[in-house]
């Protein structure tokens, strides 16, 4: 689509500017390696934006954070760049086809990288509560199933608040039917239950609405996505995925 191509051009220019600043901050003895890493990340980021798999707002927020970090702590900036590069590699390796699956553990590592980069911007305002059953990490799920939910939680439940908030990410095995249960919950403002459909549309982006439609196609209606919320009690999305 045209807007994706435009975002791609803008993203390319923004990333080029950001990584030029980053390269200038590196020591001369590592300049060659740093240049190769930055060039590779630049190409992947452009492709990710154009293909619609990467939120442009997250991209620009990350670039701004990296630019600021290069001036203060070049080594930390290099570590953040490696996380960013790993994220882009994961995104571009996914097909989003009906039969594409990844281990939950891989998706969780992707989410950890995403949260680490968001923490550059939000700092202590972003708190994360992990409650993962190790037995579920080998379970297979469609790629990019969890991260959009976490992104929505941060964008709508955490970032707008001065004091930030907490995101809880949970996984468990359903003992009755051996399905995988996942949930992502924020402690933000929430909403009235009868407004869930409207709120879901507002929050959806590349997340809730698309994910629900995708599960319906991938699992022939056997997967479930449920939203729980009420005013002052946050916003929670529960997933049940057959195994």
Each model region followed by its residue ranges:
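C-terminal beta-strand of the catalytic ATP-binding
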Residues: 239-243
């Amino acid at each position: 689509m045209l807007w994706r191509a435009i975002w791609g051009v803008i993203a390319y220019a923004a990333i080029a500017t950001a990584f030029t600043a980053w390269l200038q901050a590196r020591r001369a003895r590592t300049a060659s390696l740093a240049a190769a890493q930055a060039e590779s990340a630049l190409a992947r980021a452009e492709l990710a934006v154009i293909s619609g798999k990467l939120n442009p707002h997250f991209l620009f927020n990350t670039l701004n954070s990296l630019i600021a970090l290069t001036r203060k702590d070049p080594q930390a900036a290099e570590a953040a760049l490696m996380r960013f590069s790993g994220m882009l590699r994961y995104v571009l390796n996914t097909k989003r086809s009906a039969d594409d699956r990844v281990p939950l553990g891989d998706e969780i590592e992707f989410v950890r990288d995403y949260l680490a980069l968001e923490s550059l911007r939000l700092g202590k305002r972003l708190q994360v509560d992990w409650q993962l059953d190790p037995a579920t990490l080998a379970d297979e799920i469609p790629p990019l199933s969890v991260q959009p939910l976490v992104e929505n939680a941060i964008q709508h439940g955490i970032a707008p608040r001065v004091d930030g908030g907490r995101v809880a990410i949970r996984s468990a095995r359903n003992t009755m039917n051996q399905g995988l249960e996942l949930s992502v919950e924020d402690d933000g403002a929430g909403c009235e239950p009868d407004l869930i459909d409207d709120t879901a549309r507002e929050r959806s982006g590349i997340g809730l609405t698309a994910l629900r439609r995708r599960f319906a196609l991938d699992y022939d209606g056997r997967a479930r996505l449920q939203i729980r919320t009420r005013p002052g009690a946050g916003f929670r999305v529960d997933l049940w995925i057959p195994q």
